[in-house]
């Protein structure tokens, strides 16, 4: 990978754009996930598109309206819609309705656990259904902004206004509250289970060290952070929201406390979405002008995957072994890169 300094034109970056298989989906995309050899592009409305290695497209209807959220564990893509349904689609394209809100409220957030459990939210209520089919719910102080399962144990983090709630659905007792003023819109546990980080409505992140609830202020962004991704092994948390990829260090016992983040792949426009390679210290970053870069985190070396002059990048994902990258912009122009 070659290096380009701040503002160094795209012509100075080594290009692998000729290795991308273009895919025209013809409709907006909100996220992309891999199920076996297929890239599954989640549309903004009603359906998902399965795209094979050759770029052939097959559509699967999943919702009777807008798709508001989606996650995947590599076995299924689970989505929530404004039709009040939580829907799963598997690698064979089989669709199953997992839950329907009794009041047909919008499903704002979904999360998946490794043992088959899943969570979803409608309004102020978070629901968990275990792998054995047992369902529990918890009401939090305000509308749920994000959900995430801890990497160990059945523990759910629920982001909301003025903080986050940590809930063990299988245990009695009061859930733990982590407070921080402002609206929290996304949430993630560090892979080692030691830290919790929320993305805020304002241009900042906020973190807590779970052992002692110590605060970690992660500010200085010019725009809201809409995308967060942990690097292989959880050493860094890469984020969008600035005119470079901001990567916060989490390898030490104090995480990013008292440390400056790395600033990778600077461009004159903001990063909109980030995705970390599952096995190596490499990330992919998409930008407002349609650029996609692959970045080596060790030294900032860059490869150009997609040139500028396109709509903002909306979705990025690696497959399980990191041999393929899928992307799409806000208008549905997509691509597959084989490495």
Residue locations for each model-derived region?
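WD40-repeat beta-propeller superdomains and closely related acidic/aromatic-rich repeat-like regions
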Residues: 1-339
